[in-house]
Amino acid sequence: MLQMAGQCSQNEYFDSLLHACIPCQLRCSSNTPPLTCQRYCNASVTNSVKGTNAILWTCLGLSLIISLAVFVLMFLLRKINSEPLKDEFKNTGSGLLGMANIDLEKSRTGDEIILPRGLEYTVEECTCEDCIKSKPKVDSDHCFPLPAMEEGATILVTTKTNDYCKSLPAALSATEIEKSISAR
């Protein structure tokens, strides 16, 4: 048997169970390789770690370069796309201002102010005096409390609404009808 162990090559060991020379790479993954294979296994582990480190550093470097290139490319494309839009905005902006000035000059002669469309908008407002002057309807539900827009404002809105409704003659007649019905 010793003669057979001596006949195995440098990267092989003699397996006494099989009575044959077996490559050391098969036993390097185990915790305890044979004594004749320890030098081979230590060298192969070191080489594989060096290879793994080289691959990791290469992938890290490539991903860093690619991400930097994509960032620069996006920045340049945004800059190029925004320049024509600025030129168009300057051209259309001066045209709109000219139209607005012409419309304002025309409207100064009349009673109404007509603003150019797209520049501003107006909202019609109804004041309390306008609502009181208008003919009140008994069946309308505008005397109910309005929804509060902010937290904690419910009491304020309800109080103002009740005060407003008490001042309307139609609301007073509606509440008198409700009182007379409930008194029966």
Curated annotation (Swiss-Prot):
Pfam families: BCMA-Tall_bind. This is Tumor necrosis factor receptor superfamily member 17. Associates with TRAF1, TRAF2, TRAF3, TRAF5 and TRAF6. Expressed in mature B-cells, but not in T-cells or monocytes. GO terms for molecular function: signaling receptor activity. GO terms for cellular component: endomembrane system; membrane; plasma membrane. The record marks Q3, M4 as: Breakpoint for translocation to form IL2/TNFRSF17 oncogene. Residues 78-184 are cytoplasmic. TNFR-Cys repeats lie at residues 7-41. The lineage of its organism: Eukaryota, Metazoa, Chordata, Craniata, Vertebrata. GO terms for biological process: adaptive immune response; lymphocyte homeostasis; signal transduction; tumor necrosis factor-mediated signaling pathway. It comes from the Eukaryota. Receptor for TNFSF13B/BLyS/BAFF and TNFSF13/APRIL. Promotes B-cell survival and plays a role in the regulation of humoral immunity. Activates NF-kappa-B and JNK. Its main location: membrane. It is linked to A chromosomal aberration involving TNFRSF17 is found in a form of T-cell acute lymphoblastic leukemia (T-ALL). Translocation t(4;16)(q26;p13) with IL2. Residues 1-54 are extracellular. The gene is TNFRSF17. The chain crosses the membrane at residues 55-77. The keyword Cytoplasm does not apply.
